[in-house]
């Protein structure tokens, strides 16, 4: 959403992925040996079966739109919104949130970014050395990113992710946060 050219690079039709084989998108109803019954596709016999359920990430890391045209338009709207924003809230300071904060402050240096992390430190998951966390926090601080840890939102912002609409939210710790738009950078899960 930060890089205008990114959307053109990430959407690839699945039917062009394999030279010897095909991609079938559907719900597996039954598996018997090397045969899978897939809703809308009937029974499919294969030498090898790959069950790739994927991972669900919040937008803009992953798009749920069924059409790349719709997804690309949404990304373009977010980019335009970032151009007109002065304050962005990123909820979550794991790897995704940190990357997003870096991208936003690089492409839009006029935007003030606040990161809110429920855990007591950035990069809460994983076995990161304290020196790594400190170095990343220092780099973000040099970019003007405010990092708030050990606190969480009392309620989600009253606007959708990536939409430009100024709002105010309160954290569980009583902080009042104001932003023009927000991003959810937590909650990845197996699909």
Region locations from a protein language model:
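Rossmann-like dinucleotide/flavin-binding elements
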Residues: 58-60, 73-117, 189-191
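Beta1-alpha1 glycine-rich phosphate/pyrophosphate-binding loop at the start
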Residues: 1-22, 99-130
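A Rossmann-like FAD-binding core segment of flavoenzymes
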Residues: 23-26, 30-37, 110-191
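Short, surface-exposed alpha-helical segments at coil->helix boundaries
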Residues: 7-12, 72, 76, 130-137
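Glycine- and other small-residue-rich loops at beta-strand/loop junctions that grip anionic moieties
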Residues: 67, 93, 125
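Glycine-rich, phosphate-binding/catalytic loops in enzymes
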Residues: 66-70, 107-108, 132
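FAD-binding core/adjacent interface of flavoenzyme oxidoreductases
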Residues: 16-89, 172, 176, 183-185
